[in-house]
Amino acid sequence: MAAAIASSLIRQKRQAREREKSNACKCVSSPSKGKTSCDKNKLNVFSRVKLFGSKKRRRRRPEPQLKGIVTKLYSRQGYHLQLQADGTIDGTKDEDSTYTLFNLIPVGLRVVAIQGVQTKLYLAMNSEGYLYTSELFTPECKFKESVFENYYVTYSSMIYRQQQSGRGWYLGLNKEGEIMKGNHVKKNKPAAHFLPKPLKVAMYKEPSLHDLTEFSRSGSGTPTKSRSVSGVLNGGKSMSHNEST
């Protein structure tokens, strides 16, 4: 079967070559004004050669785009969550503060990264329940977004929770507008409730996930960059040993 197909193809090619030769002879013997059918055949041949001889340009694949929002997060305690230039996380009554703007970037099903618009720092929670900020996106920067009653939203760590009860560790502000330890915040209390105030829809590149071990300090598992350890562990505010327990 394969041999028959091959011989048929060879025969077809031979016939095609013979037709091209006869057409070329007719073109030479009978010149006329304007373009002849022979000229058109030549143009077609040249165009095919140019087409197949040229290198195809590789189209750049568009980078993955994630549809998120630029928003403010209004706490039920009466404060706007803010992430200041030095990495401090707290609440403020100043609605016009540019540090209250956050990028909410979807990184999974009902999972978001919370990034300060001005600082480009990510909110994160470590294995002890402390909130801190990170220049790089790590697993500690992932928060589960859950809608509570009256359209309030809670944000809990994706990787840390109470070992025995399984209760989540939540982002929260106390009545003074201070950041709280995640394991001290209960989801049914006002401290954990935030009301997003979306300003616009935005498209984001998918953050590059970095391993915690690359940036952890020995014995802590908390990434530290230019800020002090005490500052990182309490949202940017110094903390005594008694306050940390």
From Swiss-Prot:
<dbReference type="GO" id="GO:0005737">
    <property type="term" value="C:cytoplasm"/>
</dbReference>
<feature type="compositionally biased region" description="Polar residues">
    <location>
        <begin position="215"/>
        <end position="245"/>
    </location>
</feature>
<keyword id="KW-0966">Cell projection</keyword>
<comment type="subunit">
    <text>Interacts with SCN8A; regulates SCN8A activity. Interacts with SCN1A; may regulate SCN1A activity. Interacts with SCN5A; the interaction is direct and may regulate SNC5A density at membranes and function. May also interact with SCN2A and SCN11A. Interacts with MAPK8IP2; may regulate the MAPK8IP2 scaffolding activity.</text>
</comment>
<dbReference type="InterPro" id="IPR002209">
    <property type="entry name" value="Fibroblast_GF_fam"/>
</dbReference>
<dbReference type="GO" id="GO:0008017">
    <property type="term" value="F:microtubule binding"/>
</dbReference>
<dbReference type="GO" id="GO:0005886">
    <property type="term" value="C:plasma membrane"/>
</dbReference>
<dbReference type="Pfam" id="PF00167">
    <property type="entry name" value="FGF"/>
</dbReference>
<dbReference type="GO" id="GO:0014704">
    <property type="term" value="C:intercalated disc"/>
</dbReference>
<dbReference type="GO" id="GO:0005634">
    <property type="term" value="C:nucleus"/>
</dbReference>
<dbReference type="GO" id="GO:0072659">
    <property type="term" value="P:protein localization to plasma membrane"/>
</dbReference>
<feature type="region of interest" description="Disordered">
    <location>
        <begin position="1"/>
        <end position="36"/>
    </location>
</feature>
<keyword id="KW-0472">Membrane</keyword>
<dbReference type="GO" id="GO:0016328">
    <property type="term" value="C:lateral plasma membrane"/>
</dbReference>
<dbReference type="GO" id="GO:0048487">
    <property type="term" value="F:beta-tubulin binding"/>
</dbReference>
<dbReference type="GO" id="GO:0030426">
    <property type="term" value="C:growth cone"/>
</dbReference>
<feature type="region of interest" description="Disordered">
    <location>
        <begin position="213"/>
        <end position="245"/>
    </location>
</feature>
<dbReference type="GO" id="GO:0000165">
    <property type="term" value="P:MAPK cascade"/>
</dbReference>
<dbReference type="GO" id="GO:0048755">
    <property type="term" value="P:branching morphogenesis of a nerve"/>
</dbReference>
<dbReference type="InterPro" id="IPR008996">
    <property type="entry name" value="IL1/FGF"/>
</dbReference>
<keyword id="KW-0493">Microtubule</keyword>
<dbReference type="GO" id="GO:0030175">
    <property type="term" value="C:filopodium"/>
</dbReference>
<keyword id="KW-0524">Neurogenesis</keyword>
<dbReference type="GO" id="GO:1905152">
    <property type="term" value="P:positive regulation of voltage-gated sodium channel activity"/>
</dbReference>
<dbReference type="GO" id="GO:0008083">
    <property type="term" value="F:growth factor activity"/>
</dbReference>
<dbReference type="GO" id="GO:0021766">
    <property type="term" value="P:hippocampus development"/>
</dbReference>
<feature type="region of interest" description="Mediates interaction with sodium channels">
    <location>
        <begin position="67"/>
        <end position="201"/>
    </location>
</feature>
<dbReference type="GO" id="GO:0042383">
    <property type="term" value="C:sarcolemma"/>
</dbReference>
<comment type="function">
    <text>Microtubule-binding protein which directly binds tubulin and is involved in both polymerization and stabilization of microtubules. Through its action on microtubules, may participate in the refinement of axons by negatively regulating axonal and leading processes branching. Plays a crucial role in neuron polarization and migration in the cerebral cortex and the hippocampus. Regulates voltage-gated sodium channel transport and function. May also play a role in MAPK signaling.</text>
</comment>
<keyword id="KW-0991">Intellectual disability</keyword>
<dbReference type="GO" id="GO:0007613">
    <property type="term" value="P:memory"/>
</dbReference>
<feature type="region of interest" description="Mediates targeting to the nucleus">
    <location>
        <begin position="1"/>
        <end position="62"/>
    </location>
</feature>
<dbReference type="GO" id="GO:0030424">
    <property type="term" value="C:axon"/>
</dbReference>
<dbReference type="GO" id="GO:0007612">
    <property type="term" value="P:learning"/>
</dbReference>
<dbReference type="GO" id="GO:0044325">
    <property type="term" value="F:transmembrane transporter binding"/>
</dbReference>
<keyword id="KW-0597">Phosphoprotein</keyword>
<keyword id="KW-0539">Nucleus</keyword>
<dbReference type="GO" id="GO:0006814">
    <property type="term" value="P:sodium ion transport"/>
</dbReference>
<comment type="similarity">
    <text>Belongs to the heparin-binding growth factors family.</text>
</comment>
<protein>
    <recommendedName>
        <fullName>Fibroblast growth factor 13</fullName>
    </recommendedName>
</protein>
<keyword id="KW-0887">Epilepsy</keyword>
<feature type="modified residue" description="Phosphoserine">
    <location>
        <position position="208"/>
    </location>
</feature>
